[in-house]
Amino acid sequence: MVVGAKQLRKALASGRAQHVFLAENADPAITEPLADLCVAAGTELTWVASMADLGRACGIEVGAAAAATVAQLRF
């Protein structure tokens, strides 16, 4: 799993993002471009009610605007 807009952008660019979660109450300047990238990449997208909910779901003590499950790299 990756948490945060920068890490999510990297996961989308590399094709590793499998399912993206965005917080509805996060700044649209952050979430809208990420949602557009998800649509362009054909990546599943789920909107979560709040940053606090998404942060808790990710196991962190602060809110998160964005997160994703990612494919593991195989060596």
Residue positions per predicted region:
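Fold-independent oxyanion-binding glycine-rich loops
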Residues: A5, E24-N25, V70-Q72
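Amphipathic coiled-coil/heptad-repeat helices and related helical stalk/stem segments
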Residues: G4-A5, I30, S50
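Extracellular/luminal Protease-associated
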Residues: A17-P28
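Alpha-helix capping/helix-boundary segments
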Residues: Q7-L8, A26-D27, D53
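Ribosome large-subunit tunnel/peptidyl-transferase-proximal elements
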Residues: M1-A17
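Nucleotide-binding motor/catalytic cores of P-loop/tubulin-like NTPases across gene-expression machines
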Residues: P28-D36
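Alpha-helical elements of the RecA-like P-loop NTPase motor core of helicases
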Residues: K10, E32, R56
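Short basic, glycine-rich beta-strand/loop surfaces that mediate nucleic-acid
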Residues: D36-F75
